[in-house]
From Swiss-Prot:
Protein species of origin: Simian virus 40 (SV40)
Pfam families named in the record: Polyoma_coat (PF00718)
Subunit field text: Homomultimer; disulfide-linked. The virus capsid is composed of 72 icosahedral units, each one composed of five disulfide-linked copies of VP1. Interacts with agnoprotein. Interacts with minor capsid proteins VP2 and VP3. Interacts with host HSPA8; this interaction probably participates in virus assembly. Interacts with host SP1; this interaction enhances the efficiency of viral packaging.
GO cellular component: capsomere; host cell endoplasmic reticulum; host cell nucleus; T=7 icosahedral viral capsid
Domain of life: Viruses
Phosphothreonine modifications at: T338
Protein name from the UniProt record: Major capsid protein VP1
Domain comment, as recorded: The intrinsically disordered C-terminal arm interacts with neighboring pentamers. The unstructured nature of this region allows to make different interactions depending on the structural context: pentamers present at the 12 icosahedral fivefold axes bind five pentamers, whereas pentamers present at the 60 icosahedral six-fold axes interact with six pentamers. A DNA-binding domain overlapping a bipartite nuclear localization signal is present in the N-terminal region of the protein and is required for efficient virus formation.
Region (C-terminal arm) residue spans: 302-362
UniProt effect for mutating I99L: In strain: 776
Length: 362
């Protein structure tokens, strides 16, 4: 009987040629910008390292990373927290190197955020159970930080877009904060009137705003919330975890105007003082973002650039409304060429929005 043929490749045999990569669309639309191929080259990648400090309230110079002691009101109508009791979003804009010498070309380069490595800094500081914290036993260690915690970060080519949702629409927030305007009972659920852009650090209370899932096409955000009275904080430390920022088309956030935006909130729980009062405890977050150059179709024609340059030189006035739903403009007339003097001055002839000549009497 003939020996059976040995299965598998023979030693020393040439390796099989790998399959060709799957073809994907090269041209996609992203936020109104037509994305072309990725520019190759050694200098096409860059890394940005930064960190964001927490904005818990910082009630005094000795309590950075903590909020002011919290106090729960008995009545919904009496709720009026201080600014120092409200943890707020941390945000920063990172200016990137200018990579376009000529903005009048048909194609330009934009920075594209590809990956991010991030972690919370200072986790081991919460092992301090001997500094001003309430004792768990008469002669024991202090009570560890515990309670509701929220960890969130975002990386984008534009500021994070927010949706407002309130737990109590009757709460009176301090003037130094940005909260949903004209709050009603509908503000305690989805109300599309409450939209905002995270454009200021330490101004948007976390309890009032969440990332808007219907927007943020040019931003990637990640977050987890764990609620409860005695919930311990669970945090991981590693420099090997990488979060990919590309979408299903293989495109990451495109940094408009050479600007990269990072946002974060890291509320680890409640610190219990010796007196029994409690404060929110927050920690800073580290970012390491990798960017590459992406060739895109120039979305800014030369006429737009010139118009923008001229408009920037115009004095801005915060005056009464002359456009929009509340416009105070009554009528606009445009005259062209000349005609014989009409015998009836009340007879008005004009071209309507459909291009038709119309005559009407006053």
């Amino acid at each position: 009987m003939a020996p059976t043929k040995r299965k598998g490749s023979c030693p020393g045999a040439a390796p099989k040629k790998p399959k060709e990569p799957v073809q994907v669309p090269k041209l996609v639309i992203k936020g109104g910008i037509e994305v072309l191929g990725v520019k190759t080259g050694v200098d096409s990648f860059t890394e940005v390292e930064c960190f964001l400090n927490p904005q818990m309230g910082n009630p005094d110079e000795h309590q950075k990373g903590l909020s002011k002691s919290l106090a729960a009101e008995k009545q919904f109508t009496d709720d009026s927290p201080d600014k120092e009791q409200l943890p707020c979003y941390s945000v920063a804009r990172i200016p990137l190197p200018n990579i376009n010498e000529d903005l009048t070309c048909g194609n330009i380069l934009m920075w594209e955020a590809v990956t991010v490595k991030t972690e919370v800094i200072g986790v081991t500081a919460m092992l301090n159970l001997h500094s001003g914290t309430q004792k768990t036993h008469e002669n024991g260690a202090g009570k560890p930080i515990q309670g509701s915690n929220f960890h969130f970060f975002a990386v984008g080519g534009e500021p994070l877009e927010l949706q407002g949702v309130l737990a109590n629409y009757r709460t009176k927030y301090p003037a130094q904060t940005v909260t949903p305007k004209n709050a009603t009972v509908d503000s305690q659920q989805m109300n599309t009137d409450h939209k905002a852009v995270l454009d200021k650090d330490n101004a948007y209370p976390v309890e009032c705003w969440v990332p808007d899932p219907s927007k943020n096409e040019n931003t990637r955000y990640f977050g987890t919330y764990t609620g409860g009275e005695n919930v311990p904080p669970v945090l991981h430390i590693t420099n090997t975890a990488t979060t990919v920022l590309l979408d299903e088309q293989g495109v990451g956030p495109l940094c408009k105007a050479d600007s990269l935006y990072v946002s974060a909130v890291d509320i680890c729980g409640l610190f219990t003082n010796t007196s029994g009062t409690q404060q929110w405890k927050g920690l800073p977050r580290y970012f390491k973002i990798t960017l590459r150059k992406r060739s895109v179709k120039n979305p800014y024609p030369i006429s737009f650039l010139l118009s923008d340059l001229i408009n920037r030189r115009t004095q801005r006035v915060d005056g009464q409304p002359m456009i929009g739903m509340s416009s105070q403009v009554e009528e606009v007339r445009v005259y062209e060429d000349t005609e014989e003097l009409p015998g009836d001055p009340d007879m008005i002839r004009y071209i309507d929005e459909f291009g038709q000549t119309t005559t009407r009497m006053q």
